[in-house]
A protein has these predicted regions:
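S-adenosylmethionine
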Residues: 1-165
């Protein structure tokens, strides 16, 4: 689901390249849209690709540093928390939410996840290191965090949040 027709249009060729066939993008008006309400408690997995400052992409988009401010990041964190809360309602017991951004800011990543876990004690943080190890990928830490200077990629963050069965 997304509120942006442009992002949904951009998603279609990316899905085709990925080989995924079980993804059905759909437009919604907001995180309380009736399409989402119908799925409450029924979904196995939700990926929250949260709108963010994009500061993890500075090496490709250096002008971003001039377009972001403390106020704009503060506005984004409110939106991120609301979207993550809405995603949590979709997941069945035993299901999973993955929260991801292309930001390096603690305010958009760790702080959002930590506040979410306080608001939603029915969820636990599953260490990314364990999930990645099952795929043969060595990684330390509770979160997946890609850093441009270490991994030669854009900056990226992901947290795995499992709903207790």
């Amino acid at each position: 689901f997304d509120v942006s027709d442009k992002r949904l249009a951009n998603l279609k060729p990316r899905l085709a390249r990925s080989g995924l066939s079980n993804v059905q993008p759909a437009r919604i008006e907001h995180e309380r849209d009736t399409k989402i309400k119908r799925l409450a408690g029924k979904v196995d997995r939700v990926l929250v690709d949260a709108p963010c400052s994009g500061l993890g992409t500075l090496r490709r988009n250096p002008d971003l540093k001039w377009r972001q401010s403390e106020d704009s990041v503060a506005e984004l964190t409110v939106k991120q928390a609301a979207i993550l809360d809405a995603a949590a309602k979709l997941v069945r017991p035993g299901g999973r939410v993955v929260y991801a951004t292309c930001s390096l800011l603690t305010a958009e990543n760790d702080a959002i996840v930590e506040a979410f876990l306080v608001r939603h004690p029915e969820f636990t943080l599953t260490p990314a290191s364990g999930v990645l190890a099952k795929q043969g990928i060595a990684h330390d830490g509770d979160f997946l965090r890609l850093l441009p200077h270490q991994h030669n990629t854009d900056g990226f963050f992901a947290a795995i949040l499992d709903k207790k069965a």
